[in-house]
A protein has these predicted regions:
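Bacterial N-terminal signal peptides that target proteins for export
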Residues: 1-10
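Bacterial N-terminal signal peptides
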Residues: 9-18
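N-terminal, motif-rich segments that launch catalysis or mediate targeting to/interaction with membranes
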Residues: 18-111, 124-206
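C-terminal regulatory domains involved in ligand/effector binding and gene-expression control
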Residues: 175, 187, 205-227
Length: 227
């Protein structure tokens, strides 16, 4: 099957992303993973599948990769739905990413799917580190839950710790500049998201995100403000 080859290529990319040296996985860290893997892995993967792509098309695809890298967290943003994000993180998470890769029909959708793959890889490796960080920063939670405090144990503490990791990385100037991110842009492949979500869970996206256009626009704006 043609799609199988690209899923295998994406699996190799997953291994690269899994070893990237970032501990916290807020918005900035997820985008930084795209930057780390862009020249060596993501761009070549796009060019292999779409050999005729122009430089401008590759640049636009970069913006879609940024969008895909935080799509699993869409439900946390205003007008979102936590159930959407909980599904993508805890129920058939890998299947969702696989469907994204299979359902991608053009270079922008494929870049968006690779961004979602990077998020999946980052969460597998990074969340245990964040859980340990929560226990260190919140002794009262450590006393209650032990040396690993998950998002389910205390969502607020988990999100604050993730963001704190981002702040530390910014302070140490480990991220590519805001000007570069603004130059590249930030795009969301709504059609691919809808197809992959329904293929994975058997329900339409708008059953969870009733204001999906507003949700996605708010998500795009909020992420651009964090950068």
């Amino acid at each position: 099957m043609p799609g199988t080859k690209y899923v295998l290529q994406a699996t190799l990319l997953l291994l690269v992303l899994w070893t990237a040296p970032l501990l916290g996985y807020g918005v900035l860290s997820h985008e930084e993973l795209i930057d780390i893997a862009w020249d060596g892995e993501i761009r070549p993967a796009l060019q292999r599948r779409f050999p005729g792509a122009t430089d401008d098309e590759i640049k636009l695809a970069h913006a879609y990769a940024y969008g895909g890298s935080v799509i699993q967290d869409l439900g946390y943003y205003p007008f979102g739905n936590h159930e959407f994000t909980n599904l993508l993180h805890y129920v058939r998470s890998g299947d969702f990413v696989a469907w994204m890769l299979r359902d991608a029909h053009n270079i922008n959708e494929y870049a968006f799917a690779l961004g979602a793959l990077s998020h999946y890889a980052a969460d597998i490796w990074g969340h245990p580190a964040v859980n340990a960080g929560v226990a260190i920063e919140y002794p009262n939670l450590r006393a209650r839950f032990g040396h690993s405090v998950s998002y389910e144990d205390n969502p607020e503490a988990h999100l604050k710790t993730e963001f704190s990791f981002d702040v530390v990385q910014v302070a140490k100037k480990r991220y590519i500049s805001k000007q570069y991110h603004d130059f590249i842009g930030f795009r969301v492949s709504e059609d691919l998201l809808e197809r992959a979500f329904e293929d994975t869970y058997g329900i339409k996206l708008d059953e969870l995100l009733h204001f999906d256009d507003l949700t996605i626009e708010t998500y795009r704006f909020a992420v651009s403000r964090v950068r």
